[in-house]
Structures are given as structure tokens and as C-alpha cells.
Amino acid sequence: MDTPRVLLWAIFLISFLWDLPGFQQASISSSSSTELDSTKDVENRKGGKMQRTPQESAEGRTPKEHRPRPNELRRRLPGQSLGQEPPGRGPRVVPHEYMLSIYRTYSIAEKLGINASFFQSSKSANTITSFVDRGLDDLSHTPLRRQKYLFDVSTLSDKEELVGAELRLYRQAPPTPWGPQTRPLHLQLFPCLSPLLLDSRTLDPQGPTEAGWEVFDVWQVLRPQPWKQLCLELRAVWGELDARDSGARPRGPQQSPPLDLRSLGFGRRVRPPQERALLVVFTRSQRKNLFTEMHEQLGSAEAAGAEGSWPAPSGAPDAGSWLPSPGRRRRRTALSSRHGKRHGKKSRLRCSRKPLHVNFKELGWDDWIIAPLEYEAYHCEGVCDFPLRSHLEPTNHAIIQTLMNSMDPGSTPPSCCVPTKLTPISILYIDAGNNVVYKQYEDMVVESCGCR
């Protein structure tokens, strides 16, 4: 075969192989990767985008907690530096371990499909509010015969059903033994300036004198009327109690004066925050929209501030930060339009449950929500076209509407892919009075989707 014919066959073979996709891809990948990267950089610059690695993105972005939010700038007072608490506001609330344990227990129960209101400890309540004792130490050196506990309960709403209330007092280990006493020791709780005995506890003087919590039922004093300030008084006496006496005083000739409560471990001095007296109120409220309820809390906080009560917490967000501003609406519209373009054929998938991760910190709610800071809410997405699947549990109306849409799409819109089953989650947050609240919010997680 002569040389011209060989060259002709070689040119023909190369041109044939070049048209094959695999050969062309191999040829491109064997070329310089630097040239390809530089081409991508040029294209990204033209589109106004710069590619960065995740590490570079994190380092190049100012941390969210260090950036002032618009509502935070509005709340700053003249001469107040960023991050400094306004005058009159206390330090950031530290949740009591009891409230944290309630949240942990009920959250685990919800994941197992058990409603938290079924627990006996919840008293069938969906809201549990804790109030920390605001009383001051008795600095005198005289025996402490009566220990008073003060609580600001002005944030309690008369629209909620009160189903229980208890006072939790931590009894520290006594510094000295009680002595060779054979009579029982009675702890009695009264409303301040009232002879009405609310509850009592009996301690065995011969038993172990270990530290622990004493729990008193105070539902009786909160039930008749909503209080703004609640004052409770603790006393301790030896001897048998006369059940016929409304004051439940000791009976018999061996009556002794009330004991020094400090010697029993009820003094306030050198007491860490987790051992302070705690008033826990159990209420049951009707189902509310999350935003509506928070608006009501802001309104009550502003009213309380006008009356000269304790100020609202620094963590309570402004109402404007919850509502969609025009800028947010435009941004959401732009995102939704990009979303539609990006999905293309994927948007034609049938109605089903899709992931939706909610991060309260990204929403700017981490300054008043304690836990959880994030959760999986899910959402419903997809089309409801004919024929509808049985697992979508369509209503009769949805079936007819889908059938009409399949016959004439221009006359009838298709049925919508919406949640058909929603479940609650537990949220631990700080209310307008700086109190730690556990609440079970309904309709927070999508469990199933259907066509409606």
C-alpha cells in the first residue's frame, strides 16, 4: 500500500473516532486541567459568581452571632455598645435542670409516638412554665422562722386552663444533726399573710438527712384568680398535727416554737441557681398559630413594661422580625422562580414528602428558643395528576377535581399536594417575663402527604 493511501486511511480513521463521545471525552480529560479550571473561573466571573471551597466560604463569611440584626440595632440605646444589655435587664436566663429534664423526657416520648400530655407528671398540660424565686436573703442573724418565696406570675394568661401548680424547694443537707428527736418534723406551706394551709410534708428525724427536693402542691392558691405577684411562706414544726385545725398546728402539751429553717437546709445563702426555689405551673391552652401566640406575648410584655413591672427579656424578638418584609417577599419570589427553573422534570414527580430542615439559629430565634435549635419539619411537594394513588388518601373532591383537570387542564386546576398528618414537637423557650417555658406545639412536623 503506497504512502498517500496510508495517510488517507489514517485521516479517515481519526475523523471517525473523533465523532465518538468516549474518545472526545478522553481527549478533553487528557488535556491540561489548569486550562479547564481557568476556563471555569472565567465563566464564573462572567456570571458574577466565584467558586469557593466550604472552608473558604465559612472563613469568608462573618459569623451570624457576631452580626447585628436589624431589630437588635433598633433596640440599642444611645451610648450602648453592641452586645451590652440595656439597663434594667438581667443576665441571660439559665434554664433550670428540672425544665431541661422535662424537655428531654417529652421529646424522646414524641419520637416514640407518645403524646407528652399522657404523662402523669405533665398533668395533661401542653404548657409548663417555671418561675424562679425572686425573694432576697434574710441577712439578720436571728432564727429564720418563716421563709418567704416571691414569684412574678404576671405572664400567666387567664385564657389558659390551669391544671396544676407545684412549688419545688431544694433542701440542703443540714449543717448540724437534728438531735435525738422522736417526734415527726412537719414542713408547712401557706400563702403569705394567710392561715390557709396549702400543703405539708413530714420528715423523719431518725431518717437520713440527705439533700433533696421537697414538692408542695400550690394549685389551690393559683386557681381562684390570676395573680401578678405570688408570695408563699414555709414553716417547720415538731409534733403531731391537729387535722381539725385549719392552720394545722401541733397539738398536745409538747408544743414547741417554729424551727430555724436555716438549720433544716432551707436558707438562701450560698445557694447556686440550680438550687433556687422553683414554681412550676401546668396549663392547657387551645391550639394557636405560633406567630399569633408570640405576638400576644409581645403585647403582654409591652403592657407589663408600661406598668413598671420587670422588663421583657433581651431574647424576645421584635414583631417586625417575624413578619415577611417586602424585601423578604421579593427574595422568596426570586428563589421560588429559580427553584422552578432548576427542577424542570423533577418538579413533575408525584406528590410525596420531602426533607425540610429548620434551623432556628438561622431564623434569628436562637436568642429566645433554648431547644431544639434545629429540627426536621419536612414538606409536601409534587403533582397530583390522574390517576391518583390510594396512598395519597385523596378526598372525593380531589378525585373529581383531578379527573376534570385531566380532561381539560385549562378549565380546572389540579388538586394540591398538602400535609395530611402533622405531629407536634416540644420547644423550650424564654417568654416575655424571662421565664423558661416548655410547650408542645402542634402541627410542626409533616408525617404524610396527600392530594386535596
UniProtKB/Swiss-Prot annotation:
CC per GO annotation: extracellular space
Ranges of Basic and acidic residues composition bias in the record: 37-46, 58-75
Superkingdom of source: Eukaryota
Compositionally biased tracts (Low complexity): 301-317
Database matches in SMART domains: TGFB
Signal peptide: 1-22
Subcellular locations according to the entry: Secreted
Region called Disordered, residue ranges: 29-93, 244-267, 301-348
Function of the protein: Growth factor that controls proliferation and cellular differentiation in the retina and bone formation. Plays a key role in regulating apoptosis during retinal development. Establishes dorsal-ventral positional information in the retina and controls the formation of the retinotectal map. Required for normal formation of bones and joints in the limbs, skull, digits and axial skeleton. Plays a key role in establishing boundaries between skeletal elements during development. Regulation of GDF6 expression seems to be a mechanism for evolving species-specific changes in skeletal structures.
PANTHER family assigned to the protein according to its UniProt record, in alphabetical order: GROWTH_DIFFERENTIATION FACTOR 6, TGF-BETA FAMILY
Protein known as: Growth/differentiation factor 6
Gene for this chain: Gdf6
